[in-house]
């Protein structure tokens, strides 16, 4: 692998230009038009066309399915956020001024920049639109009697964690890259994602590795390292303060329910645009009574349905056709799991009375077993197509350190370095 081929640099430059070509004009429209302006609707097909042009370029960025997926996901959710702020939430300059994000006397360029910053702030951190359950900074960064976080401590901690995560992703790829194609076909071949009772022991192990382990380690770290690098650059360049760059993932302890897995443990980067669509359909289109169980679960369903459409689009950009993607069934059954566990919890409360204090350990253990079983059963629908990719498309880091020092040395370095990190800078799992 070349480090940065000139063709890749040119492709990245083109993609950045296209990304700005639909986000910056959207910010301009938000600032300069009233909420009901026809121009907002007229801009929508232009926005979608630019996104389409962006999608055509993604496969030429790298040979890495992961990195191309990050690019496709970032652009797709940015486009959805544009539509959200223009047509659903319908923000305008007055609301941005009222929220303290811009000053009317500022130049047009400054006001557009403020709108653009809000647009790409998918979690709305530090604004009145901040989504729920955004994780707080680690205790290591939050010193007593200090209202602001130390930029130096933030940069040091994030840099150290990024190095560890880089080594981990490198180790995972180098450990699996020599898997024979026959083994991949036997474990993750087409149709095996829906095989349960007649699966072999080896295939059951494959379901565990993809359905449970991949969410806890490779998938989480893949997305987390991108977020950390992005925030680190913003803080180093003093574009953002450390306070605005909160962690992207929650703690594993929050994943003892399906609702907690998606609402607290997993990243909330898409939550604002996704929940806006769900609320819009349930309350404005269907006009369901609020509050009501029907409105609540309809909202949840359309939130996950929109997420399924986004992931389906990303798969298509990466060359996985809709017929070969399991995004739609995987995400659309999540509301059923949430309804089931809500019902069980409600019955339990009525039988035992309101809970007092912390949730008992045995209940949390049952919760983890439930979540693990659900992810084991359904995750292969969505993740197996990616697991079938050949090794030359599964690399996650541009330069392999593990390839130079060897697997055994890398394992020891990763273990020692991880322990030091955990105790020295407040590692959190």
UniProtKB/Swiss-Prot annotation:
Topology class, membrane: Multi-pass membrane protein
Protein localization: Membrane
Gene Ontology cellular component list: membrane
Biotechnology: Pyripyropene A and its derivatives have very unique characteristics of selectively inhibiting the acyl-coenzyme A:cholesterol acyltransferase 2 (ACAT2) isozyme. Therefore, pyripyropenes are expected to be developed as a new type of anti-atherosclerotic agent. Furthermore, pyripyropenes have been shown to exhibit anti-angiogenic activity against human umbilical vein endothelial cells. Finally, pyripyropene A also exhibits insecticidal properties.
One annotated GO molecular function: O-acyltransferase activity
Family to which the UniProt record says this protein belongs: Belongs to the wax synthase family.
The name this protein goes by in its record: Acetyltransferase pyr8
Native species: Aspergillus fumigatus (strain ATCC MYA-4609 / CBS 101355 / FGSC A1100 / Af293)
Lineage: Eukaryota, Fungi, Dikarya, Ascomycota, Pezizomycotina
